[in-house]
Amino acid sequence: MQKFAPSVLVLALGAALAGCQDQGPQKDHVKINKNPYPSTYSVSDNSSTLITNATVLTGTGEKLEQADVFIVDGKIAQVGKDLSVSADNTIDAQGKWVTPGIIDVHSHLGAYPSPSVESHQDGNEMTSPNTAEVWVEHSVWPQDPGFNRAREGGITTLQILPGSANLFGGRGVTLKNVPAHTMQGMKFPNAPYGLKMACGENPKRVYGSHKIAPQTRMGNMAGYRQAWIEATEYKSAWEQYDAAHAAGLNPDAPKRDIKYDTLRGVLDGEVMIHNHCYKAEEMAMMIDLAKEFNYHAGTFHHGIEAYKIADMLAENGSCAALWPDWWGFKMEAYDMVQENVAIVDAVKNSCAVVHSDSDITIQRLNHEASKVMHTVNQNGFAIKEQDAIKWITYNAAKSLGVENETGSLSKGKQADVVIWDKNPFSVYSKAETVYVDGAKVYDRNDEKYQAVSDFMLGQR
């Protein structure tokens, strides 16, 4: 059986510092550009908009009747009743509902786009158990028609993740769901990167079937631990180099490795973990693994058995991104209950999220949350709309590390807003108007705001 690479990294990198002699002019300080592909997104509309007479779900646990939302310069300026303000645009939303823009924390749009043909399958780099060096943003095709379909369902922000074949699948990217010709034109400015990890059946099946480690769950854990040991050594070598240079010495920089740049980003608290993990005991092990190497376990995705460890997730500050009713399709996805989301949500300081992992259900993520609310309320819970909306707005933003920017209709936050024709938790509801940073990006009643990707031109 193939073994994981031996831990010689620290010796090799440490040797690079042997040149820390104060002789000759000091070399330039080698710095790693942590954002070589920056966002080029910019707010497209600075006009002011007043939405009046709506039922407003703020995303912070409030439900306001006959309320107004005032947007100025792409930000939420005020939310309340009978606002006395003047605006460039006024919309009477009598009988309609207003919520924050919907956020999906688990999508593969652009990396597994439509049409689903082999040449477009760019989400899983199944060449090694550890491909932390790959960035899914380099696979994202902005012309995927799925982005427009998702926007029609109120999706304003989404995280694109690599697939779950590998122990470390690579970096995810958070996007603004706006029409653009490049990925960078959609990239959410300054949003933290994510690192996709995967527990359980997928990595051991993909590599074990070829008699390559990991072949078992214990092989999975060994692979994670070895990678974090090497990442810790890489981090130490660069910190020693930085300290030596700051002290006026003349060290040689360690050799750069983009795989370990990503893992170091996690250790430094700059990259957030997003962990494909179904079973309770495996989520618990991943929390312990994070403690062993002093990083945060982040968000657990799918989490079929999250209800079994809801207290542990809350105590660790981990979000759980869950499906309402998708389970039983493989053994590790067997032991779920329909109350999963609600049980996680019921614990103090919890972070329950409803996600899609689907190009279909992302179009109706409000209905996915609605399924949970209506089902559990028939079984003794008392979930209200103002609480359930958090699963696809504020809590989702928290999972992505952008809760200070979006996810609620709070003063000063980005004006990512959806006007619904009726209660968004009704199966009959439709997103009528969608705003991103205060700019109208979709209007069900105006074709000018119904974007069509270049790929779809002439096809409908």
Q: Which role fits each region the language model picked out?
A:
Residues M1-V8:
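Bacterial N-terminal signal peptides that target proteins for export
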Residues A16-G19:
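C-terminal motif of bacterial Sec signal peptides marking the signal peptidase cleavage site
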Residues N33-P36, Y41-S48, V56, T60-T99, ...:
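Histidine-rich, glycine-flanked metal-binding segment
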Residues S39-T40, D45, S114-P115, Q121-T127, ...:
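His/Asp/Glu-enriched, well-ordered alpha-helical/loop segment
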Residues A54, K398, S410-F455:
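C-terminal cap of metal-dependent C-N hydrolases
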Residues A54, V69, G74, G95, ...:
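Divalent metal-coordination and catalytic microenvironments
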Residues G146, R151-T299, K430:
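Polyanionic/metal-chelating signatures
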